[in-house]
């Protein structure tokens, strides 16, 4: 449509929030950011270290247009990914520049492991098994680094803190944050780092393979697996230009444009050792469930109506993830768990009425950024921009880590949140709306011992 369309879902966080007077200004603000992701030798060959580095690289590159991975050596990837056999090769395929020394031009540094302070603004990724987050200083040493899910979350939150500086128009202090991905609704205790041994689902049904669905796949692929494992992938859409900036599996370049999203996800999962079954059509509640079908559905759909249909479809467990769509709530994460197709009353708010959505769109059209945009794309193009939601890749990545963590809880026969709400700006202050009953029987899983 226009050069501004490709990254529009990200730049709308600035234009729609009144933080930039034009889409051109918003892109210029993002392009000024130069992130160094510095990976220390002590974390180079760990599951969490590799996941954090590549998540930070992928999400920073999508937000800011460039990123540098700084590392003294190299190491084979612990899991098999379709982007290379080593950390260095994978980072380059994700669009990063790789160097052995920090850049003097870096504006922000994300540090992973024992590394020297870099740019004037630094944030450290931190974790200890199921605990994950960020630190401003070196007081807390990284703990157990064998769980990749924690690395994914920490890398995403670190990039979120860089993005917060762009929104504020200045560098803001780094915020210490700690979340337990095992019990995300509780205030994290440094003495409770979660289990060393747990079960991982070996059968999953993933519905919706856009921003959130691809984040589920991303996190799954970083988990080591064994034995026969199956994922049913369902989506009817194709990769389009704006997906590169928001979706973790869409790589730099135009090679994937026009491909079905299920086929892109299929490549990643097969490489990681999963068997796949593809359904390239929408699920409107008409697909009968068989005894051999996956008992856990992970839903990453945008629209509420199909989610409500699926909530009553009868999956033994459905984990539904949703995120905010506007400039004021795009960092908000909601997760719901529905048991046996019986969602509790009031689990979802009433959907916005059509006239309310239309009023919100009209409210954007008169803003300076959209009036200036009209000169480039015309009236129809301006409306298309206004109707699109705000979406940033680090929110998807963080959501993927939370959802996969809770799917693992279910497979381990532990209860999961009926409703969980988290704001990524303050992830350690999540709220809980009750817990499901623990599963009464094995859902199909393989045991993992760190």
Per-region residue spans from a language model:
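Adenine nucleotide-associated cytosolic modules
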Residues: 1-450
